[in-house]
Design a protein with these regions (language model features):
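Receiver (REC) domain switch/active-site residues of two-component response regulators
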Residues: 66, 201, 403
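Phosphate-binding loop of NTP-binding sites
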Residues: 8, 91-243, 249-257, 309, ...
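A short acidic, helix-capping loop that chelates divalent metal ions and anchors anionic groups
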Residues: 77, 147-154, 211-216, 386, ...
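N-terminal leader/targeting and accessory segments in enzymes
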Residues: 1-95, 99, 238-239, 246, ...
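Acidic, Mg2+-coordinating active-site environments of NTP-dependent enzymes
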Residues: 12, 74-80, 176, 200-349, ...
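ATP-dependent carboxylate-amine ligase
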Residues: 1-18, 37-42, 48, 52, ...
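Short secondary-structure boundary segments
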Residues: 70-73, 185, 207, 243, ...
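Short gly/ser/thr-rich secondary-structure transition/capping motifs
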Residues: 20-30, 93-96, 161-164, 183-189, ...
Length: 497
């Protein structure tokens, strides 16, 4: 079957359906990894940072592909199955995947959450509120993909999974009766077109500070990538925007092009705030209430209060009543790896995902606010093969707000672990702190946690930061199974604590 084939509509080249609907083609599934291709699959060749799917067309054919989707100019005359040339295979992958699953998002209320920090927490708070209102929900976050209480596997560790997985998850959620789905929308996922097959009813913007600049190149490109979520809001949908966040006006401008109803929020919306180690109590004026009402949350910190306000405004936009909102916030279960308290005696041990300068500063400031007398001992590192500016930022943050620091492996990947720790350490010493007195470098994460417990006194706080919920550490030799929470519990048990 060689020759030129008219590009079917589902590749995204044509505005209207024409000859071939992928749902009625003999395709078994859509694949972008040639190793996963089986008989009857369509293989979409993607050019990535480290490999090019066009180099594996032969493998895809050998494994049973019935058609190939390639970038323009990449058609192979020696391959005998249909090949479709497109302008951008990543864009086409998203559209093919949505078509293959029969556009599951069309039957769902899709809610997208973007921002540098707070995406997962905001998603979990909103999900708790929706469930309290009796809705069947799905959620796709950094932490997990979940339908009700059923957790789906995400072996990639990508927050925004590739479009075939996203569309497959949406189809499964729709088939299991979900009405609302919350999706974390990362800058990389948006820029890489993974969410192109989704039309959102509501978008949330939490905040924005520099991050992922190794991928985006500069802050302008990073902001533009984040704002792509609001381009995907349905005409006349809803946009929830943190008006106090830098760059918020850009997101509002994009939302206006979709004629979205914009709801703004900021910390000033919460009054009579009382914060303690066990949670936060504040008052809030709902749109349908004349007098402010008291809300109880088991989360602490101004950043979590902002996340809560985002979820409240989103709930109001979705028509959820204030009683369900209050109860959903109050009944929110522990979010894995987000200010997760492992132990309170004789010292407090907390695991948190904070891995940016702003995130670390926020959590340490919060811990100081609820217990200014306690020493803050921090176990932290930085990821390899990622934005190296993070290392300087992490060093600045802990130098300013911690009392003692153990620098350790996070995900070194192909980099020398000690080199990463040296770069963080250089930032700390530049701030006037001395190695040995203020910080130590212990690459092995278990040993670093053990050392933190050795130096901790009664009443201190040990913060194990950077990995949170994650279940592996990535090294050059490959990933190893890991859990900060489990490791902390095991070491505490060794100490007979």
């Amino acid at each position: 079957m060689r020759g030129n084939f008219e590009a079917p509509w589902w590749l995204g080249l044509d505005d209207e359906p024409s000859v071939l609907d992928v749902k009625f083609s003999p395709a078994r599934s859509i694949q972008f990894d040639s190793r996963n291709v089986q008989t009857g699959d369509i293989f979409v060749a993607i050019k990535g940072a480290n490999s090019d799917g066009h180099d594996y067309l032969d493998e895809a054919v050998t494994n049973g592909a019935i058609a190939l989707v390639v970038d323009q100019g990449c058609r192979r005359d020696d391959i005998a199955i249909p090949q479709y040339e497109v302008i951008n295979t990543r864009k086409s992958l998203a559209k093919i995947s949505a078509a293959f699953e029969n556009y599951p998002g069309n039957s769902l209320c899709l809610i997208g959450v973007t921002g540098t920090n707070g995406k997962s927490t905001t998603s979990f708070i909103l999900n708790s509120i929706l469930e309290e209102a009796g809705l069947v929900t799905g959620i796709m976050t950094t932490i997990e993909t979940r339908i009700g209480s059923e957790i789906l596997n995400n072996p990639t560790r990508l927050t925004s999974q590739e479009s075939p997985e996203i569309q497959s998850n949406l189809a499964l959620m729709a088939s299991k009766g979900c009405s609302h789905v919350i999706i974390e929308a990362t800058s990389i996922g948006l820029h890489a077109h993974r969410l192109d097959g989704c039309k959102f009813d509501l978008g949330i913007f939490t905040n924005l500070t520099p991050d992922h600049l190794d991928y985006h190149g500069d802050i302008t490109s990073y902001v533009e990538a984040k704002a792509l979520l609001f381009e995907k809001i349905k005409q006349g949908g809803h946009a929830i925007i943190n008006s106090s966040a830098q760059y918020s006006q850009i997101f509002e401008t994009v939302a206006d092009t979709r004629e979205a109803t914009v709801s703004r929020y900021n910390l000033a919306d919460a009054t009579n705030i009382e914060m303690s180690a066990s949670g936060t109590v504040f008052e809030f004026s709902f749109l349908d209430e004349r007098e402010p009402e008291q809300i109880q949350s088991n989360l602490i910190g101004n950043y979590n209060l902002e996340n809560t306000l985002a979820a409240i405004r989103a709930s109001e936009a979705l028509g959820i009543g204030s009683e369900f909102i209050k109860m959903g916030i109050q009944q929110l279960p522990q979010i894995p790896g987000r200010m997760e308290v492992v132990s309170r005696e004789p010292f407090t041990v907390i695991v948190d995902y904070a891995h940016t300068e702003n995130g670390v500063m926020e959590i340490l400031s919060t811990l100081d606010r609820v217990n200014s007398e306690a020493r803050k001992i921090v176990v932290i590192g930085c990821a390899g093969e990622r934005d190296k500016d993070r290392r300087t930022g992490i060093g600045r943050a802990v130098a300013q707000a911690a009392d003692f620091v153990l620098l350790t492996d996070e995900d070194p990947r192909g980099e020398d672990p000690l080199k990463i720790l040296d770069e963080i350490g250089n930032s700390i010493t530049h701030a006037g702190k001395v190695e040995g007195d203020f910080f130590e470098k212990i690459p092995d994460r278990r040993s670093a946690i053990r050392r933190a417990f050795e130096v901790a006194d009664e009443g201190d706080i040990v913060l194990i930061a950077g990995k949170g919920h994650e279940s592996s550490i990535e090294y050059k030799s490959g990933p190893i199974s890991w859990s900060d929470v489990d490791a902390a519990k095991e070491i505490l048990n060794e100490f007979k604590i």
